[in-house]
């Protein structure tokens, strides 16, 4: 049985790691195409975002603005988390909202774990209880390539 934890480890964590390495190793202004690839924002979308915001180059701050506005799964998670000011403790409702998961599987996972709130460190336990088939996320047996 594949779980949301499998998806998170294969799809989201490598993307976060690649962004972290990029931001630590590259100096702004950042290359627009690389940023688009990292955030999985199609070129037409990021070009439109840059034009709407009248941005000619990407700094660290603009990188995160683009991340909030992008439509990729990670961008959506980032946007929803920042809307909630990156909570220290997560209720099932907050987990479902941030990670775009159906509420019932998250509530079931919380009941199975006997917890009402979760720290960042506890999220993998919650994710491991949510069957991927219950989510909207596809799973590929081919690992994500790290850019």
Task: Annotate each predicted stretch with a short phrase.
Residues 46-47, 106:
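Helix-turn-helix DNA-binding helix
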Residues 50-85, 114-147:
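Short helix-start
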Residues 34-36, 95-96:
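Short alpha-helical "recognition helix" segments of helix-turn-helix
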Residues 24-26, 84-86:
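Short helix-capping/hinge SLiMs at alpha-helix to coil transitions
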Residues 1-11:
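DNA-contacting interfaces and partner/effector-binding or oligomerization modules
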